[in-house]
Design a protein with these regions (language model features):
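A short beta-strand-turn-helix
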Residues: 31-55, 72
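Thiol/disulfide oxidoreductase modules built on the thioredoxin-like
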Residues: 107, 116-162
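Conserved redox-active cysteine motifs that mediate thiol-disulfide chemistry
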Residues: 59-76
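Conserved segment of the thioredoxin-like fold in thiol-based oxidoreductases
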Residues: 33, 79-119, 129
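Conserved hydrophobic packing residues within short motifs/helices of P-loop NTPase cores
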Residues: 57, 87-89, 136
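N-terminal targeting signals for export/organelle localization
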Residues: 1-37, 164
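Short pre-active-site segment immediately N-terminal to redox-active cysteine/selenocysteine motifs
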Residues: 53-55, 59-63, 131
């Protein structure tokens, strides 16, 4: 019985992701993104454009009901923290659907597409994206201050935006 408990505890401890990284991996930074004009960037190039600013990353898709439901709360964050850069990373595999979603839902911010979608790619692997929406906050120094939030209304988002 003790051996079974030890095995179960080992499995739980090794399968859960307790890591809360403060920096993106080299592989994630090298992942490819496209802007709405279909210009190719590495994730690192995108982040460098906003160096010195706080960034809220929203990993979303036009087909995602929870993503769309969270937009009013995200727009409220934008109202409360207008100095923050809002970086929308879409996992839509259909580029036209992604662009229509931006227009239809009137999403203001910086928009990029992860062309491999939610199941593949170094950045989605690094973020361990198994559900969207997913929010990540980066401070002015490029440090990840909030690694995982699944709702725009998560109080931790506001907390790190105020404190960092």
């Amino acid at each position: 019985m003790v051996k079974k408990i030890a095995i179960v505890l080992f499995f739980i401890m090794t399968s859960c992701n307790f890591e809360k990284p403060t920096q993106f991996s080299t592989e994630a930074l090298q992942d490819t993104l496209y802007d709405v004009s279909h210009k190719k960037y590495s994730f690192q190039q995108v982040l460098e454009q906003y160096k010195g600013k706080k960034i809220v990353i929203d990993v979303w898709a036009s087909w995602c009901r929870d993503c769309v439901r969270g937009l009013p709360q995200l727009k409220e964050l934008q109202r409360k923290f207008p100095e923050v850069t809002y970086l929308f990373l879409s996992v839509d595999t259909n580029v036209n659907s992604w662009k229509r979603g931006i227009q239809h839902y009137q999403i203001k911010g910086e928009h990029y597409n992860l062309p491999k979608g939610m199941k593949k790619g170094a950045l989605v692997d690094f973020l361990n994206v198994s559900w969207i929406p997913r929010y990540v906050v980066i401070d002015e120094n490029g440090k990840i201050t909030l690694f995982k939030a699944t709702k725009a209304s998560d109080k931790n988002i506001e907390k790190v935006l105020k404190n960092s």
